[in-house]
Amino acid sequence: MTIGVGVIGYGLMGRVHTYAWRTIPLLYNGEPCNIKLVGVCDVNEQAAEAGREQAGFFFRTTDYREVIHHPEVQVVDICVPNRWHGEIIREALQAGKHVYCEKPLAYSYEEAKELAALAREAAKRGIKVQVVSEYRFFPATMKAKELAQSGFIGRLFHFRGCYLHSGYIDPNRPLEWRLRKEIIGGGVLVDLGPHLLDLMLWLLDGVDEPVAVCGMTETFIKERPLPEDPTKKAPVEVDDAASALIRFKSGALGYVEFSRVATGTEDELRFEVHGDKGAMAFNLMEPNWLWVFDRTQPPSEWGFKKLSTVQKYPPPAAYPSPKFTLGWMRSHVHAQFCFLDAIVNDKPAKPDFDDALKVHELMEAIYRSAQSGNWVSLPLEK
């Protein structure tokens, strides 16, 4: 069986996804299917041509509709800014194509509700959808999920997490698309937030759930140079940093923090989960390990222990050997393998648009709380 893939948007993430599509057959012994890179689209014609030349796509275009409606394309991979996710998803689902979409799912919470409903209808026709959440697909986080679901934590007391970057500290960094509300829909909360919030909801699914949030946001650098004319500046309308207190259904407490101006950080996604029986901790900058504390052991055995998770992916993952160290790109490869496996073998594709909607709901609640100064209850619609 051969599945044809069309990639829409050939910037950073388009290249990452293309790398993964090309790598899957090598790492999984040809499972679950053959992959054909059919079409690549970018509004920048040079970028589209680079995709055709470098990655071997059959054709390139500046019109995403040509990718969607090509008869050999079964999977539409969306790697464009948030503003255009919705229109591409609508057309792809209507055309009967499976959709793999970068996070966040939509430009807004309202649009996310609409797209999730469309995906539910499309599922009745056998169409699969998945939103990119690559941090679910590290062996360390997969092990954390297994432990959380097994009861290892016991009664949840605390969830703490952060995702910190430093790339926007320079006030002379231009007002690019990630800083423009009309394109991205928000700031760091919609840029980095979906990664950590999805991990939290996924890890604690069936264990506990958020029932209220109290959020704060801040824009530290109020204006930036315009890309087209650096001598002129314009206001920044999105947040540089965001944080939220979370109350869970059981009474457990949570705290999440996001920043693109955290001096000294690179790609710091960290979380800690503490319960009455055990605890877990993970840091993306040390992706080959999961730290665990087992309080059910005798006190003489207490202490955090480092579990080696490296590249311990389940079969049919065959290469490289599980003993070798892990990199960020490998998680994308496994995420996209799982999406193809869901299509070929009719399995659930996760995270789907309903999972992404829950993330959008959390982000919307945090923004509403930050604006009002009050706690906001969940779910938003009862």
Model region roles, listed by residue range:
Residues N29-E31, F59-E72:
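Short acidic low-complexity segments
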Residues T217, P225-D239, S243, R247-F248, ...:
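C-terminal glycine/acidic-rich active-site capping loop/insertion
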Residues P194, E257-E266:
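Glycine-rich phosphate/pyrophosphate-binding beta-alpha loops
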Residues R125-K128, Y135-V236, L290, G373:
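Predominantly a Rossmann-like dinucleotide-binding segment in NAD(P)-dependent oxidoreductases
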Residues M1-A55:
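N-terminal Rossmann-like dinucleotide-binding module
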Residues T2, Q74-V75, P81-R136, G151:
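Beta-strand-loop-alpha-helix segment that lines the small-molecule cofactor/substrate pocket
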Residues V16-L27, L115, K145-E146, L197-L201:
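Short, well-ordered amphipathic alpha-helices
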Residues N34-L37, A342-V359:
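Glycine- and charged-residue-rich phosphate/anionic-cofactor binding loop of Rossmann-like
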